[in-house]
């Protein structure tokens, strides 16, 4: 009997060391009805991503992960076809979770001996799926906010299409006229407008957007606001860009009145267009609790401001959602944490915040559960999020960035990358 008991204890210990809980048998795992597309990434986040999967996901879920390695070497070896395949897989299965990836610059091309300077994987995926990028901060009450008044979530919807990010720009080296010309495909008369008469060197730019993309952006934004139970504000500078930004304003208003006004009123919510400068001022003064629909550049900038205002860039989720809700991709809003990865390569201690990467998994799982109508999967995602928050809020176990945000600089105030994930795993078992 004693020997049998010792064997049982040893077996239990081995399971725990492998990252499995005592209830981790296949029969006890929660069944995820349909596949999730997993997009692996680079550097420190790649290491964290694997640990999250091994410690917090696979021990509890019976899930079919369609794996695509979007690490920079894999993208280079496949001429970036792996990114295209991954995006199409998300389109097929409906839900993807993505690790942070490197977007190579000239230095990265040399470092990895790349064939070329590959495009951003996020940009490629967005172009294939369409949709809107929504960024939302993860609120942990004990983490001081740079903007103390923010008590409720602020969700930033970024129209990730066109504008400056697909613009054509040029350097002007001599006097001359810059013109904007549109030639109809129907063969009709071309339209030409003078932009500027240069008397010396300068720069020029032309950018675009489409009614189709703006319409999709509007639908995704209204649906997100309803899903979150929050009012929606659309912000532009239509007083200056009367036709360009005015088109955004008009399309949003038309779609709201046609398709969403009744449901918004039913839920006690509202939609309003505001000038971007006025909206930013109101955002700073507010208590939070709304969705902001912003053009591409504005959304890029404001999402980082909101993240830092809530306490840390490491506490922000990012989700790409199509207007019809049939494709959804979740990821952390931060990068690959190169500086920590260099320390890891040297065998040095790291204290990297994994919370946003954990939430990439949970948000993807929650969406999968909603689509599949499997509340146990949604419930697990919620429990994992709460376990992560409680590790910081209740146990006061946190990584260095969060400790510094609380004004704590002693080494005893924070734990290593691995120790934090271990603590979350322990919390999840309770």
UniProtKB/Swiss-Prot annotation:
Main location: mitochondrion
UniProt keyword annotations, A-Z: Glyoxylate bypass, Magnesium, Manganese, Metal-binding, Mitochondrion, NADP, Oxidoreductase, Transit peptide, Tricarboxylic acid cycle
Residues that hold Mn(2+) according to the record: 277, 300
Name the record gives this protein: Isocitrate dehydrogenase [NADP], mitochondrial
Segment forming the signal sequence: none
Cellular component aspect of the GO annotation: mitochondrion
Organism expressing this protein natively: Candida tropicalis (Yeast)
Residues that coordinate or bind NADP(+): 101-103, 108, 285, 335-340, 353
Enzyme Commission identifier(s): 1.1.1.42
Subunit organization: Homodimer.
Annotated residues for binding of substrate: 103, 120-126, 135, 158
């Amino acid at each position: 009997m004693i020997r049998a008991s010792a064997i049982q204890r040893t077996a239990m210990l081995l399971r725990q060391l492998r990252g499995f809980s005592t209830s981790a048998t296949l029969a006890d795992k929660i069944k995820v009805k349909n596949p999730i597309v997993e997009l692996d990434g680079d550097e420190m986040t790649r290491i964290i991503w694997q640990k999250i999967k091994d410690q917090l996901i696979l021990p509890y879920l019976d899930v079919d992960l369609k794996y695509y390695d979007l690490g920079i070497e894999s993208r280079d070896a496949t001429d970036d076809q792996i990114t295209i395949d991954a995006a199409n897989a998300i389109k097929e299965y409906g839900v993807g979770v993505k690790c942070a990836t490197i977007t190579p610059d000239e230095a990265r091309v040399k470092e990895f001996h790349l064939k070329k300077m590959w495009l951003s994987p996020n940009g490629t995926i967005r172009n294939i799926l369409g949709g809107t990028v929504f960024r939302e901060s993860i609120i942990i009450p004990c983490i001081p906010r740079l903007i103390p008044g923010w008590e409720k979530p602020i969700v930033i919807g970024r129209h990730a299409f066109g504008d400056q990010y697909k613009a054509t720009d040029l350097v002007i080296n001599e006097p001359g006229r810059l013109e904007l010309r549109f030639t109809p495909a129907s063969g009709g008369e071309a339209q030409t407008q003078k932009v500027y008469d240069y008397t010396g060197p300068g720069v020029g730019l032309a950018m675009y957007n489409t009614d189709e993309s703006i319409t999709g952006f509007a639908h995704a934004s209204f649906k997100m606001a309803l899903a979150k139970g929050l009012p929606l504000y659309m912000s532009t500078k239509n007083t200056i860009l009367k036709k360009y930004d005015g088109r955004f304003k008009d399309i949003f208003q038309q779609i709201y009145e046609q398709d969403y006004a009744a449901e918004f009123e039913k839920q006690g919510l509202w939609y309003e267009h505001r000038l971007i400068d006025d909206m930013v001022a109101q955002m700073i003064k507010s208590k939070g609790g709304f969705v902001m629909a912003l053009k591409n550049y504005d959304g890029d900038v404001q999402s980082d401001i909101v993240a830092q205002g809530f306490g840390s860039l490491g506490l922000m989720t990012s989700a790409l959602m199509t207007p019809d809700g049939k494709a959804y991709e979740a990821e952390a809003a931060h990068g690959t944490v190169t500086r920590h990865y260099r320390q890891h390569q040297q065998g040095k201690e790291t204290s990297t915040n994994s919370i946003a990467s954990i939430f990439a998994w949970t948000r993807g799982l929650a969406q999968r559960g909603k689509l599949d109508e499997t509340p146990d999967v949604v419930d697990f995602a919620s429990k994992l999020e709460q376990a992560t928050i409680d590790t910081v809020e209740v146990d006061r176990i946190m990584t260095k960035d969060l400790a510094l945000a609380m004004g704590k600089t002693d080494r005893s105030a924070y734990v290593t990358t691995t120790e934090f994930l271990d603590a979350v795993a322990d919390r999840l078992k309770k």
